[in-house]
Structure formats: C-alpha cells, structure tokens
Amino acid sequence: MKHPLETLTTAAGILLMAFLSCLLLPAPALGLALAQKLVTMFHLMDLSQLYTLLFCLWFLVLGAIEYFVLRFIWRRWFSLAD
C-alpha cells in the first residue's frame, strides 16, 4: 500500500533536487544571436525573461532526473522492503 503523502513527497523531492541542481550543476549559456532569436520567437520582452524561463525549466528537469535516479538507486540497493 502506498503512503497517502507519497505524491506530496515526490513533488517536494523534485523541488529539492532542483534547488541542489542550482547550486551544483552548470546552467546552459546561449549565444547572443540565439538568445535574441528565441526572444523574438516566443514574443518575450527582453533577455531576462528568456533566461528566467530557461533556468526554471533547466533546473526542474535536472531535479526530476536526479530524483528518479536517486529513487531508483534507493529502491534497488538500499530499501529494506521486500
């Protein structure tokens, strides 16, 4: 039986891993020409909006990947449940 708060802890774990990614992993750096092209394509006001969206997506994706990797490792080698 699953714990009733498992979905909440999953979301919290992803956000925690995203925070750790912000501290430990490099963020993508775009060239000026590509950044201007993306700003125009997505109808943004300036580069700061683009980088805000880019960093949020980047770190949430990395956090989700880290969470699932750590969960797999935990369940595979360290979990005591049968």
UniProtKB/Swiss-Prot annotation:
It is found in: Cell membrane. GO terms for cellular component: plasma membrane. It is a multi-pass membrane protein. It comes from the Bacteria. It holds the Pfam family DUF1158. The keyword Disulfide bond does not apply. Keywords: Cell membrane, Membrane, Transmembrane, Transmembrane helix. The keyword Transcription regulation does not apply. Coiled coil: none annotated. InterPro entries: DUF1158. Its main location: membrane. PROSITE patterns: PROKAR_LIPOPROTEIN (PS51257). The chain crosses the membrane at residues 8-28, 50-70. This is Uncharacterized protein YbdJ. It comes from Escherichia coli (strain K12). The lineage of its organism: Bacteria, Pseudomonadati, Pseudomonadota, Gammaproteobacteria, Enterobacterales.
